[in-house]
UniProtKB/Swiss-Prot annotation:
One of its GO terms (cellular component) is cytoplasm. Keywords: Dioxygenase, Iron, Metal-binding, Oxidoreductase, Phenylalanine catabolism, Tyrosine catabolism. One of its GO terms (biological process) is tyrosine catabolic process. Homogentisate binds at residues 347, 368. It comes from Pseudomonas savastanoi pv. phaseolicola (strain 1448A / Race 6). The keyword Repeat does not apply. Its EC number is 1.13.11.5. This is Homogentisate 1,2-dioxygenase.
Length: 435
């Protein structure tokens, strides 16, 4: 197998939403046109569209690929015998739910077989909503994969990953994320003995940076910190399995060439990575706890103006300086639906029970907030400036109800006693105001 790349295969291009271009060999990118009659290197021109042709130019996403064999060169797909087990939506359940960390399998399992379905909003053939998975794997993929159902946001919690994409290579580790466009072929190699993390499959409009409003022209996730691959390709004619996810089902075909044979490309429908440690956190310097929307990294807009199909929000290390304020996240009943995970450390609203690799789900109007231990400490605390360190929690927040999967409601990781953390909330009511 011949592998071709630049001298530094893991160089990246910087920026968000750019019209990127990259070639692994000189002459791979045609000049002045997209689809020449005869490509100088004998490559096929293929357009990879992420939006309809007629959307506003500011919304359009497409990339031109120059590859050794066109993607169309494949035989018929066959439905696979092994599907994503337990992904059917379970019975309606308004309760607050929390899960312990999911185990790494004992037997060899790759990234795709290691998918654990937790929740979804609606059928994947609709142009909105999300599906949420955990992955737990201990073996690198030998096959290739793509999802026709949505864009993938991958959040590692344990173990480093190398993601081979049609556009090049992405290395990510815990505290970094990767985003793969709908339909992009990829393969995941484990750089450690095992890996675990979270996936949000976005069925709606592609993720983008949130508007900053009065914050101004800088802050939150800055565009220059997003990294996109440079061109990299394989030139071989060895058989390889290609799996696609289509309407929630897995289908397979076999290629006689590598699906990662793109020698050059240009466009803005791209894979990218981002280091969450570079997030410019905004918070109060006077009083009260601002709404968590100030921690939004990426957003996919929904049909209702101002209401997201999905917001990806993080709770990173930060200084707490608010005066005369209950500093943890306040008690809340939300129109939106909140799925939370923990990458590292502890979450400041929960003293115990919410561990790295675990998850929680608070659906529309499910009352939630700090547990009793956290609330008692916050009420009694001396309000000196202090820094919350060694933490990284995140939230997938969506305007649609997240229905837990059949697997999520029946697995041993589901905590039967989650509601108990709010039992015996200390009564502090006093008819006479405090002096």
């Amino acid at each position: 197998m011949a592998i071709h790349s630049r001298s530094d295969a893991l160089a990246y291009q910087s920026g968000f939403g750019n019209q990127f271009s990259s070639e692994a060999l000189p002459g791979a990118l045609p000049i002045g046109q997209n689809s020449p009659q005869k490509h100088p290197l004998g490559l096929y021109a293929e357009q990879f569209s992420g939006t309809a042709f007629t959307v506003a130019r500011s919304e359009a996403r497409r990339t031109w690929l120059y590859r050794i064999k066109p993607s169309a060169a494949h035989p018929r797909y066959q439905r696979m015998g092994r599907q994503i087990a337990g992904q059917e939506q379970g019975p309606i359940n308004p309760n607050r739910l929390r899960w312990n960390a999911f185990d790494i399998p004992a037997e060899p399992v790759d990234f795709i077989d290691g998918l654990i379905p937790l929740a979804s909003t609606s059928a994947a053939d609709q142009a909105d909503g999300v599906s949420v998975y955990v992955y737990a794997a201990n073996t690198s993929m030998q096959r290739a994969f793509f999802s026709a159902d949505g864009e993938w946001l991958i959040v590692p919690q344990q173990g480093r990953l190398r993601i081979i994409t049609e556009l090049g290579l992405l290395d990510i580790e815990p505290l970094e994320i990767a985003v793969l466009p709908r339909g992009m072929k990829f393969r995941v190699q484990l750089l450690d003995s095992s890996a675990r993390g979270y996936i949000c499959e976005n069925h709606g409009c592609a993720l983008r940076l949130p508007e900053l409003g009065p914050i101004g022209s800088n802050g939150l996730a800055n565009p220059r910190d997003f990294l996109t691959p440079v061109a990299w390709f394989e030139d071989n004619q060895q058989p390889v399995e290609l799996v696609q996810k289509f309407l929630g089902e897995l289908w397979s075909t076999h290629l006689e060439h590598s699906p990662f044979d793109v020698v050059g490309w240009h466009g803005n429908n791209v894979a990218y990575k981002y280091d969450l440690r570079r997030f410019n956190t905004i918070g109060t310097v006077s009083y009260d706890h601002p709404d968590p929307s100030i921690f939004t990294v990426l957003t996919s807009p929904g049909a209702a103006h101002g209401q997201a199909n999905i917001d990806f929000v993080i709770f990173p290390p930060r200084w707490m300086v608010a005066e005369n304020t209950f500093r943890p996240p306040w008690f809340h009943r939300n129109l939106m639906n909140e799925f939370m995970g923990l990458i590292d450390g502890a979450y400041d609203a929960k003293a115990e029970g919410f561990m790295p690799g675990g998850a929680s789900l608070h659906n529309c109007m499910s009352a939630h907030g700090p547990d009793n231990v956290t609330a008692e400490k916050a009420i009694a605390a001396e309000l000196k400036p202090h820094k919350i360190e060694n933490t990284m929690a995140f939230m997938f927040e969506t305007g649609k109800v997240l229905r837990p999967s059949r697997h999520a409601l029946g697995c041993p990781q589901l905590q039967a006693d989650y509601d108990a953390c709010w039992n015996d909330m200390t009564r502090t009511f006093n008819k006479e105001p405090r002096r």
